[in-house]
């Protein structure tokens, strides 16, 4: 495996996934070589005047992996531990995810190495605007359309789209997605990824067990994805018995009441504490206990590589639905399938966010809007159809995992586009 940049375990695992998919699909090796490296990598150094008057520089990236299917599309994360190698892996996953969803997008990802919790609101705004200026030459409605990711949100997108609009001298709503409803956004975006995870779980449960009603679920992570996955799983009839974040686990055998998720803006430890108090149960301080609970469905919805070979034997769920990007290592996934546990891969399960971004982009390009109910209906239809296609492919190939079926389906669409263009 030839690379000219610093690698990480996450990037290596992603490349192995792509390589396996190319081989399973019977596609030529030069296709893998075309996907092995991004089309373009931008590294930026962003100056921010801090509240103490000093200038501090923050390193950032924008990785544009492949645009055979259309403009680059992918989020921007602000996190103190981001690396260029991991950003490349995430851009590759976006290429696969966008292809699998049938969207007219290629894959990209952006990042800034910063802990946004340590910035004041003014500092965060200056950093967001600085990043938008730094990447402006490479983005646009038909070039590259960023969105939020870990550590960023709709307010950060609002600052970025405002800064970009200033630079080009016109309102440019379609350049960034997941904006606030007050600034060309759509209210469904707040919960779209978590909603999509719940839809994926429901559709697979329907095919495995006849339905999701009454099935028990545990959700690891109470960020935007996890909190809304828990909420919508309950609304679809599952019994959410446990939720967790880095501070611990809240568990109640007869099921948790997670209705407050829709009403509260609380995040992280505050949300975990609120759920604990509302349900009258204590927080168990070991967050890893979430993986060993006896449940039907486990939703890892926090960060990558949390289900690993050193803890996978403790996983008791029968269905793992990946809300996060890359939460299950390849070795752990093999062990799960050997035990009959099905894993719904990230590029299928958590595509609700980018599908919603596509719907918002279409609205912005045409200066029209759909109401919340119509938007959610369109999102649900696309997610359900994607699950049906991948599940049918997986059923035909008995030796494959569902990830194999998803990756092959995504790669075939990319390959056909590249071949038609004359790139291969």
Curated annotation (Swiss-Prot):
Q: Does the keyword NADP apply?
A: no
Please list the GO terms describing molecular function: glutamate dehydrogenase (NAD+) activity; NAD+ binding; NADH binding
Biophysicochemical property: temperature dependence: Optimum temperature is 80 degrees Celsius for oxidative deamination. Retains full activity after incubation for 10 minutes at temperatures up to 105 degrees Celsius.
Residues binding NAD(+): 193, 224
User: What EC identifiers does the entry list?
Assistant: 1.4.1.2
* Role: Catalyzes the reversible oxidative deamination of L-glutamate to 2-oxoglutarate and ammonia, thereby playing a key role at the intersection of the carbon and nitrogen metabolic pathways. Is strictly specific for NAD(+)/NADH as the acceptor/donor, since it cannot use NADP(+)/NADPH. May function in vivo in the catabolic direction. Also catalyzes at low rates the oxidative deamination of L-norvaline, L-2-aminobutyrate, L-valine and L-isoleucine, and the reductive amination of 2-oxovalerate and 2-oxobutyrate.
* Comment on pH dependence: Optimum pH is 10.5 for oxidative deamination, and 9.5 for reductive amination. Retains more than 80% of its activity after incubation for 30 minutes at pH 4.0-10.5.
Record-linked CDD domains: NAD_bind_1_Glu_DH (cd01076)
Q: In what way is its activity controlled?
A: Is not regulated allosterically.
Question: What is one Gene Ontology biological process annotated in the Swiss-Prot or TrEMBL record?
Answer: glutamate catabolic process
Q: Give the reaction(s) catalysed.
A: L-glutamate + NAD(+) + H2O = 2-oxoglutarate + NH4(+) + NADH + H(+)
Site annotation (Important for catalysis): which residues? 149
Q: Which organism is it from?
A: Pyrobaculum calidifontis (strain DSM 21063 / JCM 11548 / VA1)
Question: Per its UniProt entry, what is the enzyme's top EC class, as one word?
Answer: oxidoreductase
At the top level of its lineage, which domain of life is listed? Archaea
Q: Which family does it belong to?
A: Belongs to the Glu/Leu/Phe/Val dehydrogenases family.
Its name, as the record gives it, is NAD(+)-dependent glutamate dehydrogenase
PANTHER family found in the cross-reference section = GLUTAMATE DEHYDROGENASE, GLUTAMATE DEHYDROGENASE 1, MITOCHONDRIAL
Summarize induction of expression.
Is constitutively expressed.
Q: Which residues bind substrate?
A: 73, 97, 357
Summary of subunit composition and partner proteins: Homohexamer.
Q: Where is the active site?
A: 109 (proton donor)
Query: Record's Pfam families?
Result: ELFV_dehydrog, ELFV_dehydrog_N
Keyword set for this entry?
NAD, Oxidoreductase
Listed SMART domains: ELFV_dehydrog
Reply yes or no: does the keyword Glycoprotein apply. Answer: no
Lineage of origin? Archaea, Thermoproteota, Thermoprotei, Thermoproteales, Thermoproteaceae
């Amino acid at each position: 495996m030839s690379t000219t940049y610093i690698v990480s375990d996450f990037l290596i695992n992603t490349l192995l996934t792509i390589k396996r998919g190319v081989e399973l699909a019977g596609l030529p090796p030069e296709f893998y070589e075309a996907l092995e490296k991004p089309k373009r990598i931008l590294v930026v150094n962003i100056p921010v005047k801090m509240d103490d008057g000093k200038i501090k520089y923050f390193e950032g990236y924008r990785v544009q992996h492949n645009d055979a299917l259309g403009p680059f599309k992918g989020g921007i994360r602000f996190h103190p531990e981001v690396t260029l190698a991991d950003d490349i892996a995430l851009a590759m996953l976006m290429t696969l995810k966008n292809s699998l969803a049938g969207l007219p997008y290629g894959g990209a990802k952006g990042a800034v190495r910063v802990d946004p919790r340590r910035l004041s609101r003014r500092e965060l705004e200056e950093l967001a605007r600085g990043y938008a200026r730094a990447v402006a030459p490479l983005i646009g409605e038909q070039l590259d359309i960023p969105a939020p990711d870990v550590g960023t949100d709709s307010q950060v997108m609002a600052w970025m789209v405002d800064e970009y609009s200033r630079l080009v001298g016109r309102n440019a709503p379609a350049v960034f997605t997941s904006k606030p409803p007050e600034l060309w956004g759509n209210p469904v975006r707040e919960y779209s990824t978590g909603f999509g995870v719940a839809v994926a779980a429901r559709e697979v449960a329907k095919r495995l067990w006849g339905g999701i009603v009454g099935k028990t679920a545990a959700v690891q992570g109470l960020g935007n994805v996890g909190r809304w996955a828990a909420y919508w799983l309950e609304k679809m009839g599952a019994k959410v018995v446990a939720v967790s974040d880095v501070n611990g686990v809240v568990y109640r055998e007869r099921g948790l009441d997670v209705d407050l998720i829709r009403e509260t803006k609380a995040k992280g430890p505050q949300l975990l504490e609120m759920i604990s108090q509302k349900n009258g149960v204590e927080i168990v301080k070991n967050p890893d206990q979430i993986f060993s609970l006896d449940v039907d469905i486990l939703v890892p919805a926090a960060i990558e590589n949390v289900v690993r070979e050193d803890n996978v034997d403790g996983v008791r769920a029968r269905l793992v639905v990946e809300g996060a990007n890359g939460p299950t290592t390849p070795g752990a996934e093999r062990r799960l399938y050997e035990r009959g546990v099905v894993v719904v891969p990230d590029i299928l399960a958590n595509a609700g966010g980018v599908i919603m971004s596509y719907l918002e982009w279409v609205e912005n390009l045409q200066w029209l809007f759909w109401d919340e109910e119509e938007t959610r209906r369109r999102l649900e239809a696309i997610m359900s159809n994607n699950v049906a296609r991948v599940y049918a492919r997986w059923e035909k190939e008995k030796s494959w995992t569902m990830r194999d079926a998803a990756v092959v389906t995504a790669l075939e669409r990319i390959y056909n586009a590249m071949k038609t263009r004359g790139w291969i």
